[in-house]
Curated annotation (Swiss-Prot):
Protein name: NAD-dependent malic enzyme
Essential cofactor(s): Mg(2+); Mn(2+)
Note on cofactor: Divalent metal cations. Prefers magnesium or manganese.
Domain of life, source organism: Bacteria
UniProt site positions, description: Important for activity: D270
Family: Belongs to the malic enzymes family.
NCBIfam families (alphabetical): PRK13529.1 (NF010052)
Gene that encodes the chain: maeA
GO biological process: malate metabolic process
Pfam families reported for this sequence: malic (PF00390), Malic_M (PF03949)
Organism phylogeny: Bacteria, Pseudomonadati, Pseudomonadota, Gammaproteobacteria, Enterobacterales
């Protein structure tokens, strides 16, 4: 499923002179040919030498290496993105291992916190509650008419950092950068959006540089009516768009997903994308150990919308492997700050109710307390898999990990909280506490661990292995909805590309250098499943693959021809 080399057709454009140089999607900078410089009134506006994109990328790489901090590197890359998008993606794809953590997690967290301070140039759409009656006009102001993917946030739950107001715009920008870099979706088809509904972050409200609406967050009916106005305006402007909800607070994330997933082609990456990549990782890890996921007992720390979304997808996968729903649910244990979720626990959220354990089934557990802590659960359940989505650092203690290892020779430990400052335990500690026997996957990037002269590669359970392929598959197939089965097909495909499964060694997830290949394979699986489920028009496998090839954008300059407006 490698992309076929295709001759790029000439592009006819009406812009010229300084206007063309200020258009990030079209600007080539020093790579404009002499003929183009004459035809587009660029003579004298650029240095004499005509460069290739690789020469430009090499200069940018040298400049990038001159920056000492990750946030300065992030600012530099964003500046390139805002002046020459083709060069930006060529540079990022040339150095994806180095630059993905800079354009997205963990560095994007700091960029969101400092958004108003480091702001240079507008990108995307800012829709404030004050402008709610101008929603249609705002979307009409977007110059790109053929938007195919929107990532939207309200900035309330940015990574593990909480309410960042309009600073949350850094997340949709970063996410869409990965749709392009990893999934080949043209940047001309993407649109980042932030819904500015105020902020409850007092530090931002007191910051004279803060650029958002200085007001406490709207809530309840006002909030949901505002979001609905946005959804209806999007449907009117781009009826076939894929809409990704990103970093909404727990109280809103699941209700919004449930409300709109059958009204517009949409999904929530924090819930469904995280679940899909985690399940793909667990399928691969289970196969590498010579078994199936359905044979494992799993404990979660964190029972919010993300954790419960992962749990439900695990349950669906283990049912596919032959378990009944009841048996599948009995193998999943959810622990939050109040302890193990049981049917006797008050004030459960709606999405938690199906994930409780029956209290009477726990009467023989080795504890006198009515509240079962994480250590109690690990000691009594003897899990094979421990997953952290708590957003709190250090909660996987040495005592807990050693207790788990006591009963499980090859534990799978996944501290998934972002950014790195919120991780439940570091890979270095987990490897040491399990005498080198744990299989570790994290939510943020970590360097390989060296323990007793042996190198342990650490897989990043990165949603970027999933959502770009889903987006490409939706666009190529013309899917009108994203179903649970489409997400499951993405997980299964990801597991098939595990080096640990294929070779018996290495990472449990593919290397980043292979991410475009993996995204294309996921796109095919997702598109095929969409056709099988009737949410996309059925075609031959060859036609679907051709559609993926045709929609896979490459960071290459096209030849320009002049046309009138």
């Amino acid at each position: 499923m490698e992309p076929k080399t295709k001759k790029q057709r000439s592009l006819y454009i009406p812009y010229a002179g300084p206007v063309l140089l200020e258009f990030p999607l079209l600007n080539k900078g020093s790579a404009f040919s002499m003929e183009e410089r004459r035809n587009f009134n660029l003579l004298g506006l650029l240095p004499e030498v005509v460069e290739t994109i690789e020469e430009q990328a090499e200069r940018a790489w040298i400049q990038y290496q001159g920056f000492k901090t990750e946030i300065d590197k992030h600012i530099y890359l964003r500046n390139i993105q805002d002046t020459n998008e083709t060069l930006f993606y060529r540079l990022v794809n040339n150095h994806l291992d180095e630059m993905m953590p800079v354009i997205y997690t963990p560095t994007v967290g700091a960029a969101c916190e400092r958004f108003s301070e480091i702001y240079r140039r507008s990108r995307g759409v800012f829709i404030s509650y004050q402008n709610r009656h101008n929603m249609d006009d705002i979307l009409q102001n977007v110059p790109n008419h053929n938007i195919k993917v929107i990532v939207v946030t309200d900035g309330e739950r940015i990574l593990g950092l909480g309410d960042q107001g309009i600073g949350g715009m850094g997340i949709p920008i970063g996410k869409l950068s990965l749709y392009t870099a990893c999934g080949g979706i043209s940047p001309a088809y993407t649109l980042p959006v932030v819904l500015d509904v105020g902020t409850n972050n007092q530090q931002l409200l007191n910051d004279p540089l803060y650029m958002g609406w200085r007001n406490p967050r709207i809530t309840d009916d006002e909030y949901y009516e505002f979001v609905d106005e946005f959804i209806q305006a999007v449907k009117q402007r781009w009826p076939d768009v894929l809409l990704q909800f990103e970093d909404f607070a727990q109280k809103n994330a699941m209700p919004l997903l449930n409300r709109y997933r059958n009204e517009i082609c949409s999904f929530n990456d924090d819930i469904q994308g995280t679940a899909a990549v985690t399940v793909g990782t667990l399928i691969a890890a289970s196969r590498a150990a010579g078994g199936q996921l359905s044979e494992k007992k799993i404990v979660f720390l964190g029972a919010g919308s993300a954790g419960c979304g992962i749990a439900e997808m695990i349950i669906a996968q283990t049912q596919r492997e032959g378990l009944s729903e009841e048996a599948a649910r009995q193998k999943v244990f959810m622990v939050d700050r109040f302890g193990l979720l049981t049917d006797k626990m008050p004030n459960l959220l709606p999405f938690q109710t199906k994930l409780v354990q029956k209290r009477e089934n726990l009467s023989d557990r080795d504890t006198d307390s009515d509240v079962l802590s994480l250590l109690d659960v690990v000691r009594n359940v003897k899990p094979d898999i421990l997953i952290g989505v708590s957003g709190q650092t250090g909660l996987f203690t040495e005592e807990i990990i050693r207790e788990m290892h006591k009963h499980c020779p090859r534990p799978i430990v996944m501290p998934l909280s972002n950014p790195t400052s919120r991780v439940e335990a570091t890979p270095q500690d987990i490897i040491a506490w399990t005498e080198g026997n744990a299989l570790v996957a994290t939510g943020s990037p970590f360097n390989p661990v060296v323990w007793k002269d042996k190198i342990y590669p650490i897989a990043q359970c990165n949603n970027a292995f999933i959502f770009p392929g889903i987006g490409l598959g939706v666009i190529a197939s013309g899917a009108s909805r994203i179903t649970d089965e489409m997400l499951m097909s993405a997980s299964e495909t990801l597991a098939q590309y595990s080096p640990l499964v294929l070779n018996g060694e290495g990472l449990v997830l593919p290397e980043l250098k292979d991410i475009q290949k993996v995204s294309r394979a996921i796109a095919f699986a997702v598109g095929k499943m969409a056709q099988q489920q009737g949410v996309a028009v059925k075609t031959s496998a060859e036609a679907l693959q051709q559609a993926i090839d045709d929609n896979f954008w490459q960071a290459e300059y096209r030849d320009y021809r002049r046309t009138s407006i």
